[in-house]
Amino acid sequence: KAGFTRSGPDMWHINCRPDHLIASAKKSLQKLGLERIPLWQLHRIDSRVPRAEQFGAVKQLLDEGLIAHAGLSEVSVADIKAASAVFPVATVQNSYNLADRHSDDVVDYCAASGIGFIPYYPLGGDGELTRAGGALDKLAKAKGVTQGQVALAWLLKRSPTMLPIPGTSKVAHLEENVAAAGLALTDEEFAALDRKRR
C-alpha cells in the first residue's frame, strides 16, 4: 500500500502526490527485495491532489513494470470507474463485514466487473449480531464452528470475487480462518444473517 506519510506515532496523513507514490513503490521494492510488486494498493484517494495525477502515477508504475497489479482502498463505485479509465483496477479494499454493509454497491460492482474485493475488518460485528444467543452465535453453534468462521463463510458466499484476509497472530487462528473456506452456508442460512443487518 501507499498514499500515506507518518509524522509520528499513530499520526498518518494522506499523501498521494505522484512523486511520493512512485518513491514509495520504489522503496517498497527495495525493502522487499523484489523487482516487481505483485499487488500494490492506493491506500486512499487524496482530495488535495488531482485524481488524474494520482491515477497517472499508478499507470506509470504499471507501465514501468514496478507493480504487476494495482488496487484501490476506501472508494466508491464512481471512484473505481474513474480510476478504471486510466489503469486496470485489480482489487478494491473497503471496510466490509456482516455488520458494516456500507459498501454493498461496491461489492456488487466489483463482482460484476471481475474486480477482487478485499474486505477490511472482515470479522467485525456489532453487539446485536454477535451477542450470545444472537443469529451468528446460534448458527455457529449449530454447525459446530466459531462465529468468525461463519462470518468468513458469509463473506465468501456474498461475492465470487471476495478475498477476505483476516489478521491473525496465532497459528490456531490462522488454521481456523482457513477452515472457513470449507464451510458452506445454505441459501437460507446466508439470507437469515443477511436480513439481520439490512
Give the positions of each predicted feature:
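Active-site mouth loops of central-metabolism enzymes
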Residues: 2, 6-22
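Short, small-residue-rich loop/turn micro-motifs
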Residues: 2-4, 36, 168
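Short, acidic/polar
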Residues: 16-32, 76-82
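Active-site groove signature of glycoside hydrolases
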Residues: 29-50
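Short, histidine-centered active-site or binding-site loop motifs used for metal coordination
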Residues: 2-4, 41-44, 121
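Beta/alpha (TIM)-barrel catalytic core signal, keyed to glycine-rich beta->alpha loops juxtaposed to Asp/Glu
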Residues: 45-198
